[in-house]
Amino acid sequence: MPESFEEAIDAYGLTFFKVKVSGVADADIDRLCRVAAVIDAKVPSYSVTLDGNEQFSSAEAVADLLARVKEEPRLARFAASILFVEQPIARAHAFEKPVKVLAAFKPVEIDESDADIDAFVTARGLGYSGISSKSCKGFYRSLLNRARVAQWSAEDGIAYFMSAEDLTTQGGLAVQQDLALASLIGMT
């Protein structure tokens, strides 16, 4: 079994990475540079998502971090490989202001803020273009949001998207349910 990040990349052939950020810009830049150095050295072509995990109080704070990521020479490949930013703003503030300043850098998705059936509708109006799918949020909500992604993308010419989360509620059957849902909505 691999015991380090480098060994995991070698053992599993990893090319997609979900990287957490803390909301403390200096610490995040330092950590991202260290993570990027490993990935850049080991993986010829890769994709990254940044997970803010509700650690930021505002879109401006996230935009500041993203600007620094873009400006940091050691993060050039890493920045170009970012697919989207996941739920950077605390759910209590996520729907207070538009996030268009963030979306200008990379698409932004809601995750923890997806508290009710119309959360994605609200988020769309503020500039979010993505939403996560988790079995714990409900099978039908994932189907509805998948339909919204298809319809809104066709109507607006914007690439709305969904991501499949790795959250399961219990071992065994729940894993198969999550995988079946991800496959059904095209997240494979």
Language-model regions, residue ranges each:
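Glycine-rich, aromatic-flanked loop segments that form ligand/cofactor-binding clefts
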Residues: M1
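Catalytic core of soluble alpha/beta enzymes
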Residues: V19-L173
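Catalytic domains of carbohydrate-active enzymes, especially glycoside hydrolases
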Residues: S4-S22
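Acidic, Ser/Thr-rich peripheral helices and adjacent loops at domain boundaries
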Residues: L181-T188
